[in-house]
Amino acid sequence: RAFEESFRKLNIPYRIFGGLSFYQRKEIKDLIAYYRLTANHRDEEALKRVINYPARGIGKTTMDRLLVESTEREVSIWDLVTDVFNPPVSVQGAALRKVQDFTSMIQSFAAEMPTKDAHDLGMYIAKHTGLVHTLYQDKTPEGVARYDNLQELLNGMKAFTDQAKESEPDELPTLGD
């Protein structure tokens, strides 16, 4: 990852052989998708990626129904499931509650954006989504590597925010900026 970061910083093209780029790994893409959805609730790609990861009982059938209904209504999936005056008719009961619990969780992350830096928000998201717990529970070599990769991403965010605090202590941007 250190080489990748250095090459990116210097705008040097590079190619990874025999593995994945750090930022192409599932666990990294998942946390970044949570960031994206926190900053932009209508990011459908991010929503579809993480709405049921870690597993929260929101399956393909529920998502297919929401996608069809949101297309028919010409609104985003987010707008469809958060409209209290005109809730979805294609998904109801326990399935709808699970989706609404998910949107409430994302809204709680958004409420933290103005007060947390990138690292603190990342830690908050990773903990409250269950990403850290899910990856920590997987004791296979791949699971341990995924957990380590997530920790490395969070450590990189910490280094970035610490460096930014040192150079401009009064002007550290938050994700909300």
Regions found by a protein language model. Give the residues of each.
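Conserved helicase C-terminal RecA-like lobe
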Residues: 4-13, 25, 32-177
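Conserved helicase motor
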Residues: 17-25
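Acidic beta-strand-to-loop metal/phosphate-binding motif
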Residues: 1
